[in-house]
Amino acid sequence: MSEREQMKLDMVKNLALMLLEREPQLSMEQALATVLNSDTYQRLLRDSTGLYHQSPQYVYAFLESELLTGRSE
């Protein structure tokens, strides 16, 4: 596994944990499914976005906006 792939996996884990902190009624499976089925996740996978280099809080803001509005920005 490359360093870039590891950074992306760590970001997914961190996003799921942040989602659980804000929505404690979710299970870990639900939190991971939310992240993995999001447009934010698709953007994270694209190297050209550089999101894997950003802080989890920064990337979570995109996920949170997507969840609130139903679309990614």
Where is each model-derived feature located?
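C-terminal alpha-helical interaction appendages
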Residues: 1-73
